[in-house]
Swiss-Prot record:
Protein name in the entry: Lysophosphatidic acid receptor 6
A GO term from the CC aspect: plasma membrane
PROSITE patterns in the cross-refs: G_PROTEIN_RECEP_F1_1 (PS00237), G_PROTEIN_RECEP_F1_2 (PS50262)
GO biological process: G protein-coupled receptor signaling pathway
Family membership: Belongs to the G-protein coupled receptor 1 family.
């Protein structure tokens, strides 16, 4: 028995996507426009962390701009906008997904350097280096996401004039190309960042438990703990379920797993976890608040210590 003989009923996803994406569009548009305005025009202290957060907000906003087209498609179940916009929308989805993961990881590493190695890292933690890292992140995510759009084109549904987008990759494409792309983006865009986030957060917590460190920096331990907690919760809540499910989905589409119960479970989980992942556009501003508040205080404390 192969997966093609299993039940593939997942039409509930269209209603789910339409509702969730509509909420994400409204909240994400407002939150990220406000964030970009603050980072660009009103923020008095701009450092390397601000650079990462600004790029994260831009990544979110670019994806949010594509949501009205997706919402229309999921409601009407027809893509009238052409192949080019379909490819752009697919590219921006993966660019935002893994760009968000990598920029959040940059923030986590920056926090690790600021707290665990506050003075030795001063030459590394510069706005110039942060810009270089951001360029590298954009190149990496575009290199990983753009190839996926090459295999995405609009197709007619059952010989009608209605066309599809975002779905229906043939299994031959999954077996030859897409499975390799998934392996690349999962290793570079998810597993390595996940390990870095957990490791950096653990090292920061160990450092904060040293009385000498706390008294020297006079940094509120409570604020840092809140920042780490919020960061890890948002990272794990938004990205872990989807990426684990994506691996299972890839195994299903390449017919590595052919059990019908597994196929049914994965087809049910995939739309749900994708909606959770997309919601990161709304949660990222929470990271901005806790990160900018704590890092600003940390930089001030370090500057005072250097001047004394």
């Amino acid at each position: 028995m192969v997966s093609s003989n299993c039940s593939t009923e997942d039409s509930f996803k269209y209603t789910l996507y339409g509702c969730v994406f509509s909420m994400v569009f409204v909240l994400g548009l407002i939150a990220n426009c406000v964030a970009i305005y603050i980072f660009t025009f009103t923020l008095k202290v701009r450092n390397e962390t601000t650079t990462y957060m600004l790029n994260l907000a831009i990544s979110d906003l670019l994806f949010v701009f594509t949501l009205p087209f997706r919402i229309y498609y999921f409601v009407v179940r027809n893509w009238p906008f052409g192949d080019v916009l379909c490819k752009i929308s697919v590219t921006l989805f993966y660019t935002n997904m893994y760009g968000s993961i990598l920029f959040l990881t940059c923030i986590s590493v920056d926090r690790f350097l600021a707290i665990v190695h506050p003075f030795r890292s001063k030459t590394l933690r510069t706005k110039r280096n942060a810009r270089i890292v951001c360029v590298a992140v954009w190149i990496t995510v575009l290199a990983g996401s753009t190839p996926a759009s090459f295999f995405q084109s609009t197709n007619r549904q059952n010989n009608t004039e209605q066309r599809t987008c975002f779905e229906n990759f043939p299994e031959s494409t999954w077996k030859t190309y897409l499975s390799r792309i998934v392996i690349f983006i999962e290793i570079v865009g998810f597993f390595i960042p996940l390990i870095l986030n957990v490791t950096c957060s653990t090292m920061v917590l160990r450092t904060l438990n040293k009385p000498l460190t706390l008294s020297r920096n006079k940094l509120s331990k409570k604020k840092v703990l809140k920042m780490i907690f919020v960061h890890l919760v948002i990272f794990c809540f938004c990205f872990v379920p989807y990426n684990i499910t994506l691996i299972l989905y890839s195994l299903m589409r390449t017919q590595t797993w052919i059990n019908c119960s597994v196929v049914t479970a994965v087809r049910t989980m995939y739309p749900v976890t994708l909606c959770i992942a997309v919601s990161n556009c709304c949660f990222d501003p929470i990271v901005y608040y806790f990160t900018s508040d704590t890092n600003s205080e940390l930089d001030k404390k370090q500057q005072v210590h250097q001047n004394t």
